[in-house]
């Protein structure tokens, strides 16, 4: 079962508590890094010392890869949209974690509901610039400050590159850069406005 143990004086922060899960007298622990364990149908991460993890963590997967996961204060793996405060950056970030299947809990990598995520983190333009290029799987996409992929309609035309014909659209940022995108949101060119 669960055990809470206070940290060792001089090695841990004062009054720091660590949670462990023991089965047959041994704590669940990772062979290396962090690994997932299922307890009462919920997933938790433990390090090599057996300490339960909380917050956003990079976890070792069974296939040898790693992925971003997020664990609440109780250590339970979270899924779906999560708003996470990054203490290092001093800012709130938007994340999305798979909600089902073999990747449940892993940071989503791709475009979901027209929003672009890289390993779970929503990619977004600086509010000052309005638009920013983001690379995903070998393509450059244009996103706005909410992470939405900017796309052309099938009938729209680019003024910057009229030779492309229909299915292209221009977006101008605050630095007078003009981004031309196709109907998928893939950047075709970047020019400076005349």
Q: Where do the model's predicted regions map?
A:
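Extracellular adhesion/carbohydrate-binding repeat motifs centered on closely spaced tryptophans
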Residues: 1-194
């Amino acid at each position: 079962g669960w055990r809470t143990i206070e940290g060792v004086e001089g090695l841990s922060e004062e009054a720091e508590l660590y949670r462990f899960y023991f089965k047959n007298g041994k704590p669940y622990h990772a062979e290396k890094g962090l690994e997932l364990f299922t307890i009462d149908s919920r997933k938790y991460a433990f390090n090599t010392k057996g300490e339960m993890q909380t917050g956003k963590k990079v976890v070792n997967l069974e296939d040898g890869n790693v992925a971003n996961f997020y664990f609440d204060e109780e250590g339970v793996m979270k899924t779906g949209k999560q708003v996470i405060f990054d203490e290092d950056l001093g800012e709130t970030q938007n994340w999305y974690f798979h909600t089902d299947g073999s990747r449940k809990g892993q940071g989503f990598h791709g475009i979901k509901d027209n929003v672009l995520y890289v390993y779970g983190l929503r990619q977004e333009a600086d509010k000052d610039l309005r638009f920013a290029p983001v690379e995903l799987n070998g393509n450059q996409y244009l996103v706005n400050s909410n992470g939405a992929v900017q796309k052309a309609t099938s009938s729209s035309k680019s003024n910057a590159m009229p030779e492309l014909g229909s299915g292209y659209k221009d977006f101008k940022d605050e630095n007078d850069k003009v981004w031309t995108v196709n109907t998928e949101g893939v950047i075709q060119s970047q020019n400076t406005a005349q």
